[in-house]
Amino acid sequence: MDTWIYLSQGFAVAMTPENLVIALIGCFVGTIVGLLPGLGPINGVAILLPLAFALHLPAESALILLATVYIGCEYGGRISSILLNVPGDAAAIMTALDGYPMAQQGKGGVALSISAVSSFFGSLIAIGGIILFAPLLAQWSLAFGPAEYFALMVFAIACLGSMMAQNPLKSFLAALIGLGLATVGVDANTGVYRFTFDSVHLSDGVQFIVVVIGLFSVSEILLMLEHTSSGQTMVRKTGRMLFNLKEGAQCIGTTLRSSVIGFFVGVLPGAGATIASAITYMTEKKLSGNSDSFGKGDIRGVAAPEAANNASACGSFIPMLTLGVPGSGTTAVMMGALTLYNITPGPAMFTEQPDIVWGLIAALLIANVMLLIMNIPLIGLFTRMLTIPLWFLVPAIAAVSAVGVYAVHSTTFDLVLMVALGVLGYILRKMHFPMSPLSLGFVLGEMLEQNLRRALSISNGNMAILWQSGVAKALLIMAIMVIVVPPVLRLLRKHSRKPQVDAG
């Protein structure tokens, strides 16, 4: 009963005229930041943090501004991912797998509308989980140590091999290339230089923004130039703006399942929306009964990662609010905002400063309603990107990509590396290698290595720690099954057809 009283008080805080305007501004700015390749929610929140403090906003208003920017970025990241095959951030990579083919088929508006609605329900379910189960889930998340996180990364990487049902070997090879890129730089534990080729610029490793923009944006530009130089016409239709009832009904189960999975992954500190979107995409592909349609414009391939992205983003607030542990990189920045206001995140916040906690929860709900109302009418405007002539679109994408990469370290080396990775991406795409496993392998590789090192450090080098706990065992068994079961089933189906052929 107290929960609902506190929630009503939270709505009283969030629905003051000042905070409603702040939430609206945060949603709009977040959508724009999410739309721009390479920025993402961490940079969006980091940019707004000093502004919130400089404007002397109250603590609850500052937190509402940053939270709405965060959620707005999750909405905005899908736009360039679907329409241009240029993910706004790592979490939007999975959306491009089916969203971009839908846009090429003239269903860009359908993809954007289903992603907006799926994102809304993903956030709604996650916010319900925060309200009902926050303290309980915070304790559950503590059961995940380095060994469990290592097993989770292994499971996520194992799932990458199934992205291309026709040729899983190419998916695994692409993921291995991504893992290899993640090892570039100085080893944090030993100080050994790895694959730097005596270049000072590579000592810090390859930045994610450089990788994702090179592999997706630059390679896409090269493909566009190839089509225009060969006299071919790129398929760039707009089509209808909204999904129909049949398509919506098709995505109900997908959205519900992905929201729940995304929420639980988001609760785990450090897991994040990237892992949530990858796991839910592969889950839906396995459950679909027609996995061949995924990657070719299946609407469920858009609904699953989008519901998971937003559910995970909302779920990441649980460890921050209840334990004082950041659930994601973005909530880590938001914790910095709390310290600026002399607020210590943790269990005491729920009793000592309930107006801030419940005001934030209420603002998350209000922000998602605002974003849905804001984004659906703008779909027509967004899809007009598809009608922009290539002579303007190609240099525009190149300029935005170059600015995004140069902003990381302000070095021309990053621009050269971006182009080199773009050429690599172009060659791999011509050889029908998928880019998503490569980029996700790069993202997961760093987390995989960090948690492996931590686990072995705790156990003094004893490898048994990696499979001692029940959670780690379950995840590793699932990873083995994901790798082994599909080829075994294919062999069984092949042998079962042979007698029929012989009999004929």
PLM ranges: what are they?
Residues 113-230, 340-494:
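Membrane-embedded alpha-helical modules
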Residues 33-43, 82-93, 125-129, 265-275, ...:
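Short helix-coil transition sites and intra-membrane helix breaks within transmembrane domains
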Residues 1-60, 135, 139-141, 193-298, ...:
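Helix-loop-helix hairpins and the membrane-proximal interhelical loops
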Residues 71-76, 117-129, 137, 181, ...:
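Membrane-embedded alpha-helical segments of transport systems
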Residues 70-81, 88, 298-323, 327, ...:
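A structural-propensity feature for long, helix-poor, extended segments
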